[in-house]
Amino acid sequence: MYIKKKYFQAFLVLILILNHSEGLPCTTAVVSGKATNDGRPLLLKNRDTGELQNRIVFFSDGKYRFIGLVNSPDKNNHEVWVGFNEAGFGIMNSASYNLKSSDDTTKISDLEGVIMKMALDKCATVDDFEKMLEDLPKPLGVEANFGVIDAYGGAAYFETNNFDYIKYDVNDPDIAPEGYLIRTNYSFAGKENKGYGYIRYATAAGLFENQIKDGKISFEFLINDVPRCLVHSFTNTDLAENLPESVNDKDYVYFRDYIPRYSTSAAVVVQGIKEDESPLLTTMWTILGFPLTSVTIPLWLADDGSLPAILMGNESGNAPLCDLALQLKDKVFSSQNDARENYINVSALMNKENTGVYQKIIPVEEQIMKHALKSLDKWRSSGLVENEIKKFYQWIDATVIENINSKLKIEN
């Protein structure tokens, strides 16, 4: 058994005291290597939460070293909301709201982050995670769709409640005919027409269907197109069409049930490996903060736990890039308290003059991606070079925030 029952139960009591609930919508996907343009499996989590300050942490005190996204106020890093480990195992989740049976009176809840941290610490494969779910004492204190990939091509969802789970193997053509599955905030095994995120699911499904028609699914599609999609599948609206003329033309629109939301705190894609590659080439493409006001930073596991400082908590406990992304987010959402999360100023985000916040920061991201892909190509052909990872992170710290500030003329 992965963890003795008495210790697990004691840990639950501690977490119930400290827990920050994930109880808001998320949009997620698991993609088999069979459906990707390079044969590497992918995880996507567009994270929605009440805790908008997120940071990245390196863990090294268990069986496997790993990198994970945590809530900034979680000072002891009890919960991880998406991540990967040195064995090439990656995990994320979306909260579900239709999986519990009507007779489930369990009091403990919202332990998904605890379970995922435990999995990253102990699991190397999809099968390891399944065994962990079986062995852990019940009730688990969860209601979630867990998505996992591993270094052997494994890719699956586990729709999990307090006592049971159902596995969806994304490599099985009978389950995932196109090689991918999507989950928002309901489970396919749960109560019909219950839960949340049906519109977001339809939007994401449309994006994936169009992408697979044109070819294979890439990590770029997952990290660029999905979390930043301004299409609303129910109203047939696309905010990226017919843009306002100028940043001065205030153009507030109702902003609910899009994939990016006011409550979106991060978007992360874990890109796995081919079976002949080192698990250390697993890459976590990470956007801290609102995806339309932040940039993607790639992460790899360094032996000494090095990470970009702009993604780690500083003396305030917050990650500098997340702070900046939230500052820029304030420029595009309504300043009126009772309308704040419901209305977005499209002209401040994008306009025909290309002076919107998103339009100004994209060149910074493009520079990062160009540098990262060049490094990855080299490492995949000749092996990972530890010192080059550290140099890349140093370059990120030296340039990214400075370049964003320069583009937007923000004074430090």
Place the predicted regions along the sequence by residue:
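Bacterial N-terminal signal peptides that target proteins for export
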Residues: 2-10
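Intrinsic disorder/low-complexity signature
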Residues: 4, 16-17, 394
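C-terminal, well-structured catalytic/ligand-binding subdomain of enzymes
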Residues: 27-78, 82-84, 89, 93-121, ...
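Bacterial N-terminal signal peptides
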Residues: 10-19
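Boundary at the C-terminal end of the N-terminal hydrophobic targeting segment
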Residues: 23-25
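Intrinsically disordered, low-complexity linker/loop segments enriched in Gly/Pro
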Residues: 110-144
